[in-house]
């Protein structure tokens, strides 16, 4: 069910990150180099999850694997135990909670009209539902952390923290971000562009679906531009 996917991606997936933050507080303050293998593992896991996204044919699976890749960045940022790293990790968890939830919502909107989640069968929506295409574009832009959303703020904090700690991590981080942009573009083009496969009359988008997307997008922009609202 779509509600379960949205709650799982937005809230339950973040409990692991919260648990790691709590555990790091009670661990002894060891020399940070001890954690290098774990940081490399987290970033490598993010890259592998991103590569898995690129070869997915199922829309819901693609969004689920994108959640895994973002949590790899969160884990790497938490492990280095710096104020910027922790701030970036918490901001990315909030940002990705809204973004992945919105993506699952859009995937369900597509599924209700096509009755399939296979990417090659869901193309051509920009001709039929132009407003839904606008939401797809906005949410995909947020997924690749474009300003002025909190996604951009959080990834900037994480990149700064990791670069200050070990400049070499930029190679893995940069590769991860490049693949993220690639699969986001692939997801958008696969669902929106090209000739439509739908033969019957398609139901138009409803006001409740537009409202749901607005309620996902407004917090992402507001928290970034006025963080004192939540801090």
UniProtKB/Swiss-Prot annotation:
Any one of the GO BP annotations: electron transport coupled proton transport
Residue ranges of the TM segments: 1-21, 34-54, 61-80, 84-106, 128-148, 156-176, 211-231
Keyword annotations from UniProtKB, A to Z: Electron transport, Membrane, Mitochondrion, NAD, Respiratory chain, Translocase, Transmembrane, Transmembrane helix, Transport, Ubiquinone
EC number in record: 7.1.1.2
GO cellular component, one term: mitochondrial membrane
Major localisation: mitochondrion
Pfam families: Proton_antipo_M
Family the entry assigns: Belongs to the complex I subunit 4 family.
Protein name: NADH-ubiquinone oxidoreductase chain 4
Organism expressing this protein natively: Tropidolaemus wagleri
């Amino acid at each position: 069910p779509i509600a379960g996917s949205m709650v799982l991606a937005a809230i339950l997936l973040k409990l692991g990150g919260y648990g790691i933050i709590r555990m790091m507080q009670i661990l002894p303050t060891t020399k940070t180099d001890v954690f290098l293998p774990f940081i490399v593992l987290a970033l490598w896991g993010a890259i592998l999850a991103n590569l898995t996204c690129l070869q997915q044919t199922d829309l819901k699976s693609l969004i689920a694997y994108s959640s895994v890749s973002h949590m790899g960045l969160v884990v790497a940022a938490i492990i280095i135990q710096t104020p910027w790293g922790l701030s970036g990790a918490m901001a990315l968890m909030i940002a990705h909670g809204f973004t992945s939830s919105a993506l699952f919502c859009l995937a369900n909107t597509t599924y209700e009209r096509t009755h399939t989640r296979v990417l090659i069968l869901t193309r051509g929506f920009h001709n039929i539902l132009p407003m839904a295409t606008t939401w797809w574009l906005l949410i995909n832009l947020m997924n690749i952390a474009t300003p002025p959303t909190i996604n951009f703020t959080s990834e900037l904090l994480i990149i700064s923290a990791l670069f200050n700690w070990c400049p070499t991590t930029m190679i893995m981080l940069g590769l991860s971000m490049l693949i993220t942009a690639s699969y986001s573009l692939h997801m958008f083009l696969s669902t929106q562009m090209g000739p439509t496969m739908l033969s019957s009359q398609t139901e138009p988008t409803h006001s409740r679906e537009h409202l749901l997307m607005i309620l996902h997008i407004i917090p992402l922009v507001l928290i970034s531009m006025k963080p004192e609202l939540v801090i």
